[in-house]
Amino acid sequence: MALIVQKFGGTSVGSIEKIQAVAKRVIEKHLEGNRMIVVLSAMAGETDRLIGMAHAIQRVPDLREQDMLVSSGEQVSVALFAMAVKAAGYKAVSLLGDQVGIHTDQKHTRARITSIDAERINGYLDQGNIVTVAGFQGVTDYGDITTLGRGGSDTTAVALAAALQADACEIFTDVEGVFTTDPGVYDKARKIDHISYDEMLELASLGAKVLDIRAVSMAKRFKVPVHVRSTFTNTTGTWVVDEEKIMESLLVSGITYSKKEARITIKKVPDQPGIAAKIFLPISDAGIMVDMIIQNTHDGGLTDMTFTVLRSDYDRAMEILGKVAQDIRAEEVTGDQEIVKVSIVGVGMRNHSGIASTMFQIMSKEGINIMMISTSEIKVSVVIAEKYTELAVRALHDAFALDKDNLPLEVDVD
C-alpha cells in the first residue's frame, strides 16, 4: 500500500465545485489502495485579499498578526475539502499546521520548517482517513502560528513526503508539467518527462514558476520523487528526480526568463580594498538581495560596479546607494528597470564545452546586446533589454532544438 502526498494550489480549489472535483480525484486514488495525504493552498485570491485587509489596518502590518490572519485561508480550504470527502461517503480529517506538528523557526511570513511530528498523521491514516493538511503554515516552539511565504504549500507537501517517507509527492497545478520554456511565449514549448533536481533548482531560481525553490531543495535533500502535473487532466506530467534516474542527460533542458530584475551601476568608484563592502553592506542590511555583479576598471584607479537586484527593491536600493556614492566619492548612480534575465539550463553542460559561446552567437545573430553574463556548472544567464525577451527565448529554443525529444550535440547558429 503506497503512501501518496498530493498538493493542490489555489486555482485548483478556487470554488466549491473545484474542491468537490479535487475530492473526487483524491478518492479515486485512495480506492486504488493508496494512503492519501492532501495539502491544500487557500482558495485563489484569498491570500492576497487577506494581506490587503492587513494593509488597510496597518501600513506596515505586524508580521506575527499577519501570519495569524493569512493562515486562515488554508483553514477554509481543508475544512471544505474534508466535508466534500465525507459527503461522498469516505473518511477524512482536516488538520492545520500546528495540529500536524509542523514546527518552524520564528521568522514570521517566511518561516522555515525545522521538524515534523508524524505520529498524529500516521494515526489518522491507520484509521483509513484521507488526511488533508493546511499548506503554507506551521508553529514555533512558543506556539505562535507562522507562514512559509509564497510557494510554501509546495514546501509543506515535500516536507510531509520526506517526514513520512512517502512513495511520491504529486504537485497539481494549472499546467501539465515543466516545459522547455514558457508556452505563453513560444508555442513550440515541449513538456519535459523527467528533469533532475539540480536543473529544477536552477529553473526555479531563475524565474520558472511551476515549483517553489525551497520545495525542490528539500526534495533533493531527502530524495523525494516529485510529480508535477495538471489538476484538470489525467496525463502524466513531469517527474523531478535524482539525476542518476534519468537515462540520458540533455544538453539543454529548458530556457527561462525573469522580468523581475533591475540593473544598477555605481560609476567611477575608487578601486581600493574594502570598497565593495562599503557598497554592498548597506544593501544587505536593508534585506536587499544582489544577484549578478560585474566590475569594469578605468584608468586612474577608478572602476564601475554594476549589479542586479529585484525590481521590487530598485527604489530602496537607489536611495541607499545615492548616500553610499556620496560617502565613497563615486561619480553617480544609474539604473535600468527595463531588462530581463534569460537563462539556459541543462546538466548536459557538465560534459560539453561551448554552450555559453553558442548562446552568445545566437544573441549576436539576432542583434541582441548582452549587458551582463553569469554562469554555473549547468546554467548560463544573460541580461538583455526587456523588449527582446520573446525574440531571445524563441531563437534559443530553436537553436537548441528544444521542441525535439533528443537534442543535438552540435548547434547550428548560421
Where are these regions (language model features)?
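Acidic-aromatic/histidine active-site loop/patch
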Residues: A219
